[in-house]
């Protein structure tokens, strides 16, 4: 099954940017939760986890790494688990796949670690700017 996972940080976000994708999916899951919440603690993250454990998902599409979370450790743990489960994770905004044609992508681990760290740093900057603005 080909699944797209989206996450919006707040209830006020429309998600239009995420729905402009015209790719056909078997299932689209949308969590409206902060990226600091662990992937497996999110309602749709839990649904996705069950489907993966049942062997029903072969491809997981995300718009960008930050949709999986803003905590580097949690994102990497989630990606490693998905890899163990042989799920090909595809990140649309950079066109990167974890397992193209079922074979591990050698550059995947490095790129996913760097990108996850950058998104965590971005979250810290947002928090800092929010505190200064109060």
Question: Where are the regions that the model predicts?
Answer:
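Short, structured surface patches at the beginning of a domain
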Residues: 1-133
